[in-house]
Each structure stands twice: as C-alpha cells, then as structure tokens.
Amino acid sequence: MKFFIDTANIDEIKDALAMGMVDGVTTNPSLIAKEAGEFTDIIREICSIVEGPVSAEVISLDYDGMVKEARDLAKIADNIVVKIPMTVDGLKAVRTLTNEGIKTNVTLIFSATQALMAAKAGATYASPFVGRIDDLALDGMNLIEEIAEIYSNYMFDTQIIVASVRNPLHVLNSALIGADIATIPHKVLSALASHPLTDRGIESFMADWKKKENK
C-alpha cells in the first residue's frame, strides 16, 4: 500500500520524505489556508520536492469553473492531480478532464455508489473519508471494503485513497482490506512508528548499557 501525506506544510513533507514514507501528497483548501504564501506557489514547491502525485483542489463548484481551474492547475507540474468534489458537476468535470489526459482525484466520497460513479466517470483516484464517517458512529472501514469489492468486481482502474485518516488503526485496516493508498496526516504517520513496548525496550537497553559503563 502506498502512503501519501495529507498536508501542505513543507517541513512535514520533508520530514516524511526523509523517512522514505512519501509516495504522494494530498492537499485541500483548509490545509493550504494554514500555510503562508500564495496557493500556486505552495503547490509548485511541493511538486518540486515530491516525485509522486500531488493533489491540488479546485475551489469552483460549477462545471465551467472546475474545468478552467483544473486546466490551470495541471500546468503547474507534470505530477499534479486535480481534486474535484463529488457532485454532479464534479463528475462532468472529471469526464472532460479525463478525456484531456488530466489526472483527477474525486474527493468527499461518503458512499460506495459515489465511488462507483467516480470510477465510471474516469477518475484516477477516489477519496472516501473514513474518519468523518466514524464521527457519525458509522463504520468508515466498511465503506472501504465495499468500494474495494466493487472496483474488483468490475476491474476499474480507479485507485482508492483512504482519506480522513485519524489514527494508526485506520492505516492498518486499509492495508488489510487492500486499499491502494492511505493519505496520512504527519502526526498519524509519526504515531505509526511508535509503540510503548519499543519505548520500553529502548529504555531497558540504555539502562543496561549505562550499568556496564559504570562498572
């Protein structure tokens, strides 16, 4: 399974790159708004340090606006993927952009039928939001299972990006289900590398080593 990092923060991206954990980057308007600088400058810098796909989201909600923005975004770098919201106009935009060879990531997916429609429209990626589904006391990972089964049944090329990842268990379950990608916030990525027994083991080894030095 590939790891994308869900951030627009350059320092977080560089830190994850140093761990060898960045197969791609996803951003959204909320993440971009947290960073200093112009939108296109931030995206351009991310694309310059990351070899894999970099998702940048349109702001417009109408078909014409989304297509225009998407074409402009695609000119920034070859590894740009345009994020399009899961709406009727969004699906129309995805169809047009796919025919033009522009890669797309349909975002804000909350049902298997939405994911099916995204795939039929030709989306490169589909992003179901598991954490937000869990917030409603529903099972976000069950949605990933449904989408994975549908895509397998009909051999869609669309890849599943598990989004709205809140904890390491989301990542583990995504891998067990067979999702293509999980897009992970930096803090969750760091948590994946941690375990209480690892910490205890290190403390024990260091304590034993100090005893040897003091002999």
From Swiss-Prot:
Catalytic activity as recorded in UniProt: D-sedoheptulose 7-phosphate + D-glyceraldehyde 3-phosphate = D-erythrose 4-phosphate + beta-D-fructose 6-phosphate
GO terms for cellular component: cytoplasm
Keywords (A to Z) from UniProt: Cytoplasm, Pentose shunt, Schiff base, Transferase
E.C. code: 2.2.1.2
InterPro entries per the UniProt record, alphabetical: Aldolase_TIM (IPR013785), TAL/FSA (IPR001585), Transaldolase_3B (IPR022999), Transaldolase_3B/F6P_aldolase (IPR004731), Transaldolase_AS (IPR018225), TSA/FSA_arc/bac (IPR033919)
GO molecular function: aldehyde-lyase activity; transaldolase activity
Stretch forming the signal peptide: none
Cytoplasm keyword on record: yes
Subcellular localization(s) per the UniProt record: Cytoplasm
Catalytic residues (positions): K83 (schiff-base intermediate with substrate)
Family: Belongs to the transaldolase family. Type 3B subfamily.
Cited PANTHER family: FRUCTOSE-6-PHOSPHATE ALDOLASE 1-RELATED (PTHR10683:SF40), TRANSALDOLASE (PTHR10683)
Function of the molecule: Transaldolase is important for the balance of metabolites in the pentose-phosphate pathway.
Protein name per UniProt: Probable transaldolase
Source organism (scientific name): Desulforapulum autotrophicum (strain ATCC 43914 / DSM 3382 / VKM B-1955 / HRM2) (Desulfobacterium autotrophicum)
Lineage: Bacteria, Pseudomonadati, Thermodesulfobacteriota, Desulfobacteria, Desulfobacterales
